[in-house]
């Protein structure tokens, strides 16, 4: 596991959790102050847990942004993580079973293998691109180079 720290404000912006880091004991990867939580556990055959519901709670969205996680199911990607000032902090190849979590800051990825499968989880509600995203203007952005 690796935390990617802002050079601007010193906070954890992104966390990479590698499939190789899964252990038999549950690991709570993301601090409980965040709206998006992530834990990992290596499980035994026939293992179970007590059936349950979750208790409703009020969540204050005024002090946070959308948080998002990508889980690589098959294949690989090159993840790029940005600081709060839009500068690149990290570029990294993620493979099957690896997870990228963005708590704050920007991100993008490039698919490296045909038929890659990625699951994306994020806090909601998603209200469409105009109300959800601010695009980073970066001279290395391939979307800007094609215009």
Segments and roles (model prediction):
Residues 51, 79-80, 101-102, 107-112, ...:
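Short beta-strand His + acidic residue motifs that chelate non-heme Fe in jelly-roll/DSBH
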Residues 108-147:
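Double-stranded beta-helix
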Residues 83-104:
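Short acidic-glycine-tyrosine-enriched beta hairpin
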Residues 44-45, 64-82:
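Glycine- and acidic-residue-biased ligand/ion/polar-headgroup-sensing regions
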Residues 1-44, 92, 145-147:
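A short, N-terminal "cap"/entry segment at the start of jelly-roll beta-barrel domains
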Residues 41-64:
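Conserved short histidine dyad/triad with adjacent acidic residue
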Residues 41, 69-70, 106-107:
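Hydrophobic/aromatic beta-strand elements that line small-molecule binding cavities or substrate pockets
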């Amino acid at each position: 596991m690796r935390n990617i720290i802002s050079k601007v404000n010193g906070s954890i912006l992104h966390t990479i959790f590698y499939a190789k880091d899964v252990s038999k004991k549950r690991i709570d990867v993301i601090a409980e102050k965040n709206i998006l939580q992530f834990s990992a556990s290596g499980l035994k055959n026939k293992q179970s847990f007590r059936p349950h519901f979750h208790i409703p709670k009020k969540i204050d969205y005024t002090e946070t942004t959308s948080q998002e996680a990508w889980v690589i199911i098959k294949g690989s990607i090159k993840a790029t993580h940005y600081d709060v000032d839009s500068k690149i902090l990290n570029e990294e190849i993620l493979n099957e079973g690896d997870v990228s979590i963005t708590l704050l800051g920007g991100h993008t990825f490039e698919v490296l293998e045909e038929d890659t499968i990625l699951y994306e989880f994020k806090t909601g509600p998603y209200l469409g691109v105009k109300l959800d995203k601010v695009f980073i203007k970066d001279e290395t952005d391939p979307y800007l180079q094609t215009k």
